[in-house]
Amino acid sequence: MLMSLSRRELIKKEIFDIEEYVPGRSIEEIASTYGLKPESIIKLGSNENPLGPSPKAVKALIEAAPGANIYPSADAHELREALSKYTGFPVSNIVASGPGMDGLLDGLCRIIIEKGDEVIVPIPTFSYYELPARACGAEPVFIRRNQDFSLNPEKILEAVSPRTKIIFLCSPNNPSGNLLPEADLRKIIENTDALVFVDEAYVEFADRNLAALVNEYDNVAVGRTFSKVFGLAGLRLGYGIMPEWLTKEYLRAATPFSVSLPALRAGLAALSDTEYLNKSINLAREGREYLKEKIPFKVYPSQANFVLVDVSPLKAKKVTESLLKKGIIVRPCDSFREAGDSFIRVTVGTPEQNEKVVRAFEISKSEV
């Protein structure tokens, strides 16, 4: 006898609680909306590397194309070995993930979270964390950051319950760009049995990282990506650094072949091009200081490849609209939970792009 199920009833109830992820707007969309030529548009809304990928990575992509009919290694072992040299951690502490760090988050939630669990998310921050958590049945517990976007470890620990499985932290934080102090992270790790996940997507641009704590504690994992400093956002490649026990369980349930052959080859080449890596880092560090000094609004200090601009008393949407009409894509932060309506995130571009965005902010300030 057939059961009478509506199509909606086929979907897990938790899915309907998910707020769809809002990405940065594309060049094609803005060109079509505002009648602009695509080549005239400056895209500074998604924290991409304005220099593009390393030429070595591009060459590796081209050379990998004829082998697209062959499966890559199931666990991307060759890339994990290269990441071991890059990070200083044994291969047994490293996993590679596609699509990007998002795939790592999906995998961790899949092996850790059960229906009725909780995850803790200090906000505003990267909004993807709650998506895989909710999809797996967890309830996010949101903790408001301080006025300067720093964390209050005591508030986070007060929110920990027997149902808490993962605490999501971001350093440098997106969209604010500030680092998580090591002392605060230690305090959180040492006072919970939950997994503490540290998102270091932008860490190459920062003065320090927190990955060494993986050697000291068995309940901390670090996520990283090739999308930012390595300029491979379109290939969706990420990796995790975690205790050996967690690596083992992650690989047990991981999607095999999740890292495509082109992504694997490009990742290997990008890791080998230290000159290009340093060039990208220096461009971002110099550019963020220029933007902080020149943009005619309050700009927060940043350790990432972007800056956060407070345009109050103006509204971010109106200023963003003014910039879009001038062919400059930036990111209004109203899609970040509890970020408010006066913040705009601006990716560091080339020196020429940075000059144009500063001038556009100056004009928009008088127009809006």
UniProtKB/Swiss-Prot annotation:
<dbReference type="Pfam" id="PF00155">
    <property type="entry name" value="Aminotran_1_2"/>
</dbReference>
<dbReference type="InterPro" id="IPR015424">
    <property type="entry name" value="PyrdxlP-dep_Trfase"/>
</dbReference>
<dbReference type="InterPro" id="IPR015421">
    <property type="entry name" value="PyrdxlP-dep_Trfase_major"/>
</dbReference>
<protein>
    <recommendedName>
        <fullName>Histidinol-phosphate aminotransferase</fullName>
        <ecNumber>2.6.1.9</ecNumber>
    </recommendedName>
</protein>
<dbReference type="InterPro" id="IPR005861">
    <property type="entry name" value="HisP_aminotrans"/>
</dbReference>
<keyword id="KW-0663">Pyridoxal phosphate</keyword>
<dbReference type="InterPro" id="IPR004839">
    <property type="entry name" value="Aminotransferase_I/II_large"/>
</dbReference>
<dbReference type="GO" id="GO:0030170">
    <property type="term" value="F:pyridoxal phosphate binding"/>
</dbReference>
<keyword id="KW-0808">Transferase</keyword>
<dbReference type="InterPro" id="IPR015422">
    <property type="entry name" value="PyrdxlP-dep_Trfase_small"/>
</dbReference>
<comment type="similarity">
    <text>Belongs to the class-II pyridoxal-phosphate-dependent aminotransferase family. Histidinol-phosphate aminotransferase subfamily.</text>
</comment>
<keyword id="KW-0028">Amino-acid biosynthesis</keyword>
<dbReference type="GO" id="GO:0000105">
    <property type="term" value="P:L-histidine biosynthetic process"/>
</dbReference>
<comment type="pathway">
    <text>Amino-acid biosynthesis; L-histidine biosynthesis; L-histidine from 5-phospho-alpha-D-ribose 1-diphosphate: step 7/9.</text>
</comment>
<keyword id="KW-0032">Aminotransferase</keyword>
<dbReference type="GO" id="GO:0004400">
    <property type="term" value="F:histidinol-phosphate transaminase activity"/>
</dbReference>
<keyword id="KW-0368">Histidine biosynthesis</keyword>
<feature type="modified residue" description="N6-(pyridoxal phosphate)lysine">
    <location>
        <position position="228"/>
    </location>
</feature>
